[in-house]
Amino acid sequence: MSEILLLLHPTVVTEESLVESAKSGLSGKFPEASLTQHIIDRIANDMVELPSSHFDHIHYVNPNKSHLSIPPSVMAKLFASLKNGGELSGDLPKDQDLDVLMNGFIVKDDGSWSKPAPVSTVLLRKKKPAETAARKMPTFKKPVSSPVTLTDTSANNTDAEDDLSMKRKLDSTKLAYFSDDSSGEEDDLIDENELIADSHKFNVNIVVPKKCELPNGKKRKKACKDCTCGLKELEEQEEQATRNLQDTLLGKMAQSATLEAIKIEERLKKSQVQFSAQDLTEIDFTVEGKTGGCSSCALGDAFRCDGCPYLGLPPFKPGEVVTLDSFGEDI
């Protein structure tokens, strides 16, 4: 009896029809199988421990098509729970081929993942060279010592010819010896291309790196310290654009404030109040016969207004010059 694991995304719990449809499909495909059901979050948080090499097939149901990614740690747990040759199918991500391969899975043409069965290694034995006749050791001609005799210098030098022939024999012997060894070494060489099957050649899935952005309009994370995906440069451009906008707004505000201050100053200059000598003498108590607006400034603090400039001074007579020296005796 085969073991089947139905792996559910947390959002599937609210859709019972989708779960029942997945169960009926697995029952039709594996009629005599034992079905086990788990939620992927419980496996990711180690709340559920899957048995090792136990399931023949795992089916993953995830209705959230915009977020199908599976953490690499969960991939490793699912790989360990599958039997050799088992498959993982369902709503699987299409942009995590590198993580899938790193965890041991093989991506099939239909998009499912399979756990390959272990392959027994075959040792290639060293090919021995064909045995030939036993090689003889090289012989060397030992010159025979002879008594020194008088020779005719006009005759040919036979000793030089003998040395030359011996040297040629030695060279031919060395070449024969090393040529036999090199033939054996050539037999040991194995072409690497012959070890690769034709079906595996040029079958490479190009993995495109994911963009640094989240679906459903979620807030993007900050760039890493050693960011190489371009997110750091993008953030710097956004910050620079924000600074430029702020500088522009502040410049406009300062310019408008300056213009407004100039307008107010011009308005004040136009509406400046000018007092005549007659107006000024109306409140000058040094002039005889003049009194203040309240006509009681000379009577004392009890009769003076709140803003009277003579608050705190003793009563005086109208027309009298008020000085501090005149009150020195009272202090």
Swiss-Prot record:
Subunit structure of this chain's protein: Monomer. Interacts with TAH18. Interacts with MIA40.
- According to its UniProt entry, what is the function of this protein? Component of the cytosolic iron-sulfur (Fe-S) protein assembly (CIA) machinery required for the maturation of extramitochondrial Fe-S proteins. Part of an electron transfer chain functioning in an early step of cytosolic Fe-S biogenesis, facilitating the de novo assembly of a [4Fe-4S] cluster on the scaffold complex CFD1-NBP35. Electrons are transferred to DRE2 from NADPH via the FAD- and FMN-containing protein TAH18.
Gene3D superfamilies found in the cross-reference section:
Fe-S cluster assembly protein Dre2, N-terminal domain
Q: Where is the composition biased (Polar residues)?
A: 146-158
Write out the ranges of the annotated region (Fe-S binding site B).
Answer: 294-308
This one is known as Fe-S cluster assembly protein DRE2
Domain remarks in the Swiss-Prot or TrEMBL record = The C-terminal domain binds 2 Fe-S clusters but is otherwise mostly in an intrinsically disordered conformation. The N-terminal domain has structural similarity with S-adenosyl-L-methionine-dependent methyltransferases, but does not bind S-adenosyl-L-methionine. It is required for correct assembly of the 2 Fe-S clusters.
Query: Which GO molecular function entries does the Swiss-Prot or TrEMBL record give?
Result: 2 iron, 2 sulfur cluster binding; 4 iron, 4 sulfur cluster binding; electron transfer activity; metal ion binding
Q: Tell whether Isomerase is among the UniProt keywords.
A: no
Q: Which Pfam families match?
A: CIAPIN1, DRE2_N
User: What would be one Gene Ontology cellular-component term for the protein?
Assistant: mitochondrial intermembrane space
Which metal ions or organic cofactors does this protein require, according to UniProt?
Answer: [2Fe-2S] cluster; [4Fe-4S] cluster
Q: Region (N-terminal SAM-like domain) spans which residues?
A: 1-146
Q: Where is this region: Disordered?
A: 142-164
Annotated region (Linker), positions in chain: 147-202
Q: Where in this protein would one find the motif Cx2C motif 2, according to its record?
A: 305-308
Q: Where in the cell is it found?
A: Cytoplasm; Mitochondrion intermembrane space
Q: Where is this region: Fe-S binding site A?
A: 212-229
Q: Which residues bind [4Fe-4S] cluster?
A: 294, 297, 305, 308
Belongs to which family? Belongs to the anamorsin family.
